[in-house]
Amino acid sequence: MQLANLILAQLVNGITLGSLYALIALGYTIVYGIVLLINFAHSELFMSGAFVGLGVMTVLTSSALASKFPWLAPAQHFFAGSTTGIVCMLLIMFLVSMIVVGVMGMIIERFAYRPLRHAPRLAALISAVGVSLFLQNAVLLWISAQQLPFPNPIGESTAFTIGTVDVSVLKVVIIITVIVLLVALDTFISRSRFGKAMRATSQDREAAGLMGIDINLSITLAFFIGPALGAVAGIFNGMYYGSIVFNMGFLPGIKAFTAAVLGGIGNLRGAMLGGFLLGIVESLASGFISTGYKDVIAFAILILVLIFRPGGLLGESVLEKV
């Protein structure tokens, strides 16, 4: 019975963690699918989303700010004092963070990647690493080098209990929100006009241009959507772990990249599957082996997939004629 409860608890943790990995992994795969670039700056956009979210929460709920700016007092009481206020605050946090980080992604694409679009891939890769280091150190210098507490406005109350395993409201909110976003993105890509244009650009950029599709718009849209989803993951990550720091994006970013490769880089549904699988495997390893080995296992999975199935679980092998 204890073993079953342990497995169940780790599965719940794994699905929650996998939801975040899947959301971040989509940012990697949607960009790679269109421009064949591993956007290593994506992990820092994930981090930026957390800091933007914390800033919005501070403005909306800080009593210190309300004392300095009396016109903020009614809003502070509303957002901090009722369930409706908390829900509205979360929606504002997510919306502002998604817009800010999405625009950051568009700016990065315009000035760091677009000039290198016809250059060797290594040049764009080096540019991505440079942008990542710039964003990380910008937060280090301009905000703080210390961990900042990230309040959880949802609280730690239990949503329901399975056996002896309590499932918190926060975990339920994370899982449901991520699933809704994944379904919405899949529907957008497969059915909307812009989504079809992005798919056409991904399949054959030159042919799509000849058919009248705005290639630059499709690529820019990809660089908005991916970081925007990463911003949501950043906020949830802050609430889940209770703190954020300037270099918080590195490990989740690498693991999300592993999830994207596991599912099939460039395949949206593969990234979703890879994220959930990696989260579950990592949580089970933490419960049955040691928390110290969870990162080792994630990187071992990446190495094994690259060796034995580089196309990923849902990816396709491509043969190039020479």
Residue ranges and their predicted role:
Residues Y21-L23, I86, L90-M98, F223-G230, ...:
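Transmembrane alpha-helical segments in multi-pass inner-membrane proteins
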Residues G33-A41, L90, I99-Q146, F188-R193, ...:
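Short loop segments and helix-boundary regions at transmembrane helix junctions
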Residues A66-V131, L273-L278, E282, R309-P310:
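Alpha-helical transmembrane segments within multi-pass membrane transporters and channels
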Residues W71-S82, P115-L116, R121-R191, S218, ...:
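Transmembrane helix-bundle core of multi-pass membrane transporters
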Residues M1-I24, V52, T61, L65-I92, ...:
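Membrane-interfacial amphipathic/re-entrant helices at transmembrane-helix boundaries
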Residues L17, D166-I244, L268-L273:
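Helix-loop-helix "hairpin" substructures at the membrane interface of multi-pass membrane proteins
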Residues Y21-Y28, A41-F79, I126-S127, L229-N237, ...:
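Hydrophobic alpha-helical segments within and immediately flanking transmembrane helices
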Residues I7-V59, I107-A123, L262-L268:
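Single transmembrane alpha-helix segments in multi-pass membrane proteins
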